């Protein structure tokens, strides 16, 4: 079974917990730019809604040593190298910037991201 056939259970749109390549330009200040893998964190009702947006967190390939970043092994998702989910860099992007699916984040990693985001936003 191919990697691609495991995904797209949301009518071809990104689903929560999936990693997609997203065109992040334009960006402001210190935000990640270019086309990068991103974790989809918005719920599927938003992802398939009329607003045509998704909420994502970029994944960088450089370890900056920031405690809130979650490490992703390239064997867990189809990445070229070890990635680091930047939990402090939450973005809304239009669906037309979302390009291709790289896989589904393991449940344990998704829980770690949710915990870090909750701490950063004072929700938990």
Model regions: which residues?
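Conserved functional hotspots at enzyme active or ligand-binding sites that engage polyanionic ligands
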Residues: 1-124
């Amino acid at each position: 079974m191919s990697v691609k056939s495991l995904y797209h259970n949301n009518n071809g749109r990104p689903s929560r917990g999936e990693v997609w390549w997203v065109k992040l330009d334009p960006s402001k200040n210190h935000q990640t730019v270019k086309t990068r893998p991103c974790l989809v964190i918005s719920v599927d009702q938003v992802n398939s809604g009329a607003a045509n947006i998704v909420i994502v967190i970029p994944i960088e390939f450089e370890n900056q040593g920031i405690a809130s970043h979650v490490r992703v092994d390239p064997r867990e998702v189809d990445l070229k190298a070890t990635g680091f989910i930047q939990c402090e860099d939450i973005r809304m992007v239009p669906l037309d910037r979302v390009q291709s699916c790289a896989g589904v984040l393991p449940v344990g990693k998704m829980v770690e991201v949710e915990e870090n985001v909750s701490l950063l936003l004072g929700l938990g």
